[in-house]
Amino acid sequence: MTTRRAFVQPAPELLALGGAIRHLRRERELSQEALAFAADIHPKHLSEIERANKDPRATTVVRLADALGITVAALYDLSEAHGDGKPPT
């Protein structure tokens, strides 16, 4: 017998944070592998964060911000400014 999991919509904050990280990564022309290496996390974990499937720890957010060359505050500001998870225009 298998149990089906109901689809749960990711929290808007996670969508926004993941979208901001993806936007900055692409803007800097970094692959997921390159950013993950620089932030000392697994590329699969970065993919999950960008897709809002994982809620990163504070230490992971700090490492990602450092690897992207911005402050954590700037990363959160960008995610708040574009809260829909889509790249800024």
Please place each PLM-identified region on the residue numbering.
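Recognition helix of helix-turn-helix/homeodomain-like DNA-binding domains
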Residues: 40-54
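A short, Lys/Arg-rich alpha-helix, primarily the initiator
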Residues: 2-27
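Short, charged recognition helix plus adjacent turn
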Residues: 2-3, 66, 76-89
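Residues in the helix-turn-helix
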Residues: 34, 45, 55, 74
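Short, basic-rich loop-to-helix N-cap that marks the start of a DNA-contacting helix
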Residues: 53-66
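Short basic helix-loop element that most often maps to the first helix and adjoining turn
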Residues: 19-38, 63
